[in-house]
């Protein structure tokens, strides 16, 4: 969904949603976004958070996977500024969410943390000294590409055995549907978690989540990890992740807090981007859109 709203200096008004239709490609997506923005009036800046790896220097899409065909290289900032004649800023959606959590969510008071979101895939962000670490090619935090099951890499699919394939909500659904094809989303799955065969699949999925998090703890030694995505609202998931990670990490790594995102679900997905972008653009009369 494309979620948009107008920041009036205190809150968001005129909240709207429209289908992304990502499979139609990047050019079609830009036309949908422009049409949505044209439905607003009297704004002085535009902020966009989007899937894909964003070159924050020029506001273009450095890389996007096949979920949005033709999106790689898209000059989003340039397109918006030329269309609307106002300044624009573009940021990766998870990075924007992490900065929103830093300012007004569960990252408050912690300048160094990791933020991961679990949904269709797994997105990640690294916050160091109060800023997102972009990496050499704006791709730092691509945790979904970590290989956690090398034994599954047999073909040309780059995601075989990777964290994103195994630990995402999509990965959970894929597992469970092999047992019961009617359980095709997270809500249905957790409504059936008392069934032993379903709980077994959920626990195996949580094990994969924890394998990735323990690896990240060894690399970054964070004091806090923030987990977002609708599936993390399940109390059982967060409780088990905390228990298993703390049991597996080396004592020398200290204690890591694993906490749910405060802002990164539903309207908060857009809000986290907005909270950051208001520091870079105008504080009032700014229009924001989250392209999910």
Residue ranges and their predicted role:
Residues 90-94:
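Short loop/edge segments at beta-strand edges and connector loops
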Residues 1-47, 55-60, 80-88, 100-111, ...:
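ATP-binding/phosphotransfer module of carbohydrate and carboxylate kinases, centering on a glycine-rich
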Residues 20-22, 69, 140-142:
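A short acidic/small-residue loop/turn micro-motif
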Residues 17-19, 66, 137:
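Short clusters of small/polar residues that mark proteolytic maturation junctions
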Residues 108-162:
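Glycine-rich phosphate-binding loop of actin/hexokinase-like ATP-binding domains
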Residues 51:
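Conserved NAD(P)H cofactor-binding loop of Rossmann-fold oxidoreductase domains
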Residues 60-73:
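A charged helix-plus-loop insertion that forms the helical arch/lid used to bind
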